[in-house]
């Protein structure tokens, strides 16, 4: 008889994968609602497109591999992949982008490795990075939050822009991106990085409409707080563990605080890092992916801290305003090494 050797813990929660995935999907509702409120109906359209694309792509591969389609689709992992990608891209990005990114995520980043449980990288973030590198202009074309927008697209407008690039009134994406100051708007992180490189002072930057006296940007801080609320609910439901989110956020806050204290005129304050971009989405919904994260408690703390450090480094010194996706994938690479050195020692065995 052959016994499989595994590191502790040896007892596991018996809740099915589909139930865990469903809890994560439900926890995403506050974040989705906040994005709909501040950025319009495009987010919902992207979610629908990504969900359908993810299910069809997964079904196709399962059929080709002669595996059970119905049983696998019921685990809800494909839906979660599509959802995470859809909420990460601009709400009015062309329809083919979210389809392409989702199909790539499901087929190449997940099924090519053998399906759920075998993929070393987070599929949604692989799809996001592929789109960001291939189509940087479209992937950074975020709408201004409703409070500072000149043109607020309705549901029909959102569908028209996503599928044709224009709306009935004759406007296009460039028109919809105009803020109250008549300038095309960007995210708070993008605005900060671009303005610092242009020689503007932090005091000037914080007067821009995208900040308008808010801690971390109009709309964006509420979106992050909504994702935080969903994440806290996941912790309460014991669907995720606290180690990764806590170490990630503490490390990011610590690095941002130290950087800001040493260079307040070129580096963003900690509240901007914590409440802008995909910080809370990454902390609770992406980094906590049980397949691609570390499996030991010490390893989870190291994994989260590494991701937090990478996010700060990329945002502060890299070429991209929000480094969550890249940080997640780089941290994924280190998981086997982290797990190797943080495995619990077998009782009775000496170290060395």
Curated annotation (Swiss-Prot):
GO biological process, alphabetically ordered? electron transport chain; transmembrane transport
User: Which Cys-Cys disulphide bridges does the record give?
Assistant: none
Known cofactor(s) = FMN
Compartments, record wording: Cell inner membrane
Which GO terms of the cellular component aspect does the record hold?
plasma membrane
The similarity annotation says: Belongs to the NqrB/RnfD family.
- What function does this protein fulfil? Part of a membrane-bound complex that couples electron transfer with translocation of ions across the membrane. Required to maintain the reduced state of SoxR.
HAMAP family according to UniProt: RsxD_RnfD
Which proteins does it associate with, and in what oligomeric form? Answer: The complex is composed of six subunits: RsxA, RsxB, RsxC, RsxD, RsxE and RsxG.
Show the NCBIfam families listed in the entry: PRK00816.1 (NF002011), rnfD (TIGR01946)
Tell me the protein's name.
Ion-translocating oxidoreductase complex subunit D
Its organism's taxonomic lineage begins at: Bacteria, Pseudomonadati, Pseudomonadota, Gammaproteobacteria, Enterobacterales
What would be the name of the gene that encodes this protein?
rsxD
């Amino acid at each position: 008889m052959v016994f499989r050797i595994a590191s502790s813990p040896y007892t596991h929660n018996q809740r099915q994968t589909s139930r865990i995935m469903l809890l994560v999907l439900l926890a995403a509702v506050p974040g989705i609602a906040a994005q709909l409120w501040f950025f319009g109906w495009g987010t919902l359209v992207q979610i629908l497109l990504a969900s359908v694309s993810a299910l069809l792509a997964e079904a196709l591969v399962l059929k080709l591999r002669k595996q059970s389609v119905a049983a696998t689709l019921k685990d809800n992992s494909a839906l979660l992949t599509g959802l995470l990608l859809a909420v990460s891209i601009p709400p009015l990005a062309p329809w083919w982008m979210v389809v392409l990114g989702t199909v790539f995520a499901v087929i190449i980043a997940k099924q090519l490795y053998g399906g759920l449980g075998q993929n070393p990288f987070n599929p949604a973030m692989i799809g996001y990075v592929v789109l960001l590198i291939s189509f940087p202009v479209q992937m950074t074309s975020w709408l201004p939050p409703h409070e500072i927008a000149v043109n607020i697209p309705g549901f029909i407008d959102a569908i028209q822009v996503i599928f044709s690039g224009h709306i009935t009134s004759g406007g296009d994406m460039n028109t919809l991106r105009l803020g109250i100051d008549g300038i095309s708007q960007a995210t708070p992180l993008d605005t900060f990085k671009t303005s610092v490189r242009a020689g503007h002072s932090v005091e000037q930057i914080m007067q821009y409409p995208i900040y308008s006296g808010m801690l971390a940007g109009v709309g964006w801080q509420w979106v992050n707080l909504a994702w935080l609320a969903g994440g806290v609910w996941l912790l309460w439901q014991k669907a995720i563990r606290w180690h990764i989110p806590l170490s990630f956020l503490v490390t990011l806050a610590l690095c941002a605080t130290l950087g800001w204290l040493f260079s307040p005129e070129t580096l963003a304050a900690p509240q901007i890092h914590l409440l802008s971009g995909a910080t809370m989405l990454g902390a609770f919904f992406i980094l906590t992916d049980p397949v691609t994260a570390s499996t030991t408690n010490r390893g989870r703390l190291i994994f989260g801290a590494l991701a937090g450090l990478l996010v700060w480094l990329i945002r502060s010194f890299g070429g991209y305003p929000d480094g969550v996706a890249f940080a997640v994938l780089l941290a994924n690479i280190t998981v086997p090494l982290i797990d190797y050195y943080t495995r619990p020692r077998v009782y009775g065995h000496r170290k060395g």
